[in-house]
Amino acid sequence: MKLFSWNVNGLRAGLKKGTFMDFIQAEQPDILCLQETKAKPGQAEVDLPEYTEYWNSAERAGYSGTAIFSKVATDSYSQSFHDEIQSKSAWQDDSYGNPLNEGRLQIAEFPNFYLVNVYVPNSKPDLSRLQLREQVWDPALVSQLKLLEQSKPIVICGDFNAAHTEIDLARPKTNTHNAGFTKEERQGITNLINAGFIDTFRQFHPEEQRYTWWSHWAHSRENNVGWRIDYFFISNSLLPKLKSAEIHENFLGSDHCPVSIELEF
């Protein structure tokens, strides 16, 4: 089973450029998770009859959003934190809106695992959303995963908007206090790993400096001055089923590239 995740930075743009369909035809994913779709169902005309589509779009037009395209039938689907977890967290509107209404979470149940697709809030250049990340979103996500894991193993993927360690970005020293590499954001990923979830790429590529996102500025992609902020994590119990984990830098059309894993059941 081939699972892919890709922050497409606007699905309509990818469809217009042809890069999205080129990717689908080349890789034929069994399950595809998208982030930053920036569209509601029907706004992006995707002609993929072999896939069932699940959309979680932001209330704000042209912003955020996630989607799952699956050839595999789901047992259940939801797009919110469990009520108990949601009620325990101090979700508040800010200048960007309410993070619960931004289409950032999808939970699809399959026969052998739960798949969680996330577009984690960016802390913003002024770090105005760092407190949301550290105190609300990251703890709620771990709680949600551990609750689901009581029933089935977890696959979680998406854009986490944070590089975990110094080998996960080209210029760690100059980004120590910048959004995406603050100690709080890095600790959030450490907490996820400490909760028992495995960074699949590092299982196969423990020392490789490869990236999934590049700034639009200063020819960053051409010079490979990037960040690894897109991940697949899995429950430890799925490790024997994990056959590969890859980054696909050759696919263009977004400031991110796709990442993938292969599971064999």
Describe every region a protein language model picked out:
Residues 1-48, 52-54, 58-66:
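N-terminal, active-site-proximal structural segment of metallo-dependent hydrolase catalytic domains
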Residues 6-7, 24-42, 115, 144-166, ...:
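Active-site beta-strand/loop signature of hydrolases that rely on acidic residues for catalysis
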Residues 38, 44-125:
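Structured beta-strand-rich core segments of catalytic domains in phosphoester-bond hydrolases
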Residues 52, 137-225, 229:
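Metal-dependent phosphoesterases centered on the DNase I-like endonuclease/exonuclease/phosphatase
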Residues 56-59, 96-98, 221-224, 249-252:
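Short Gly/Pro-enriched turn/cap motifs at secondary-structure boundaries
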Residues 61-77, 220-240:
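Conserved beta strand-loop-helix elements of the APE1-like EEP
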Residues 71, 108-111, 235-236, 261-265:
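Active-site beta-strand termini and strand-to-loop segments that position acidic
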Residues 114-131, 171-185:
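Active-site-proximal loop/helix segment associated with metal-binding centers of metalloenzymes
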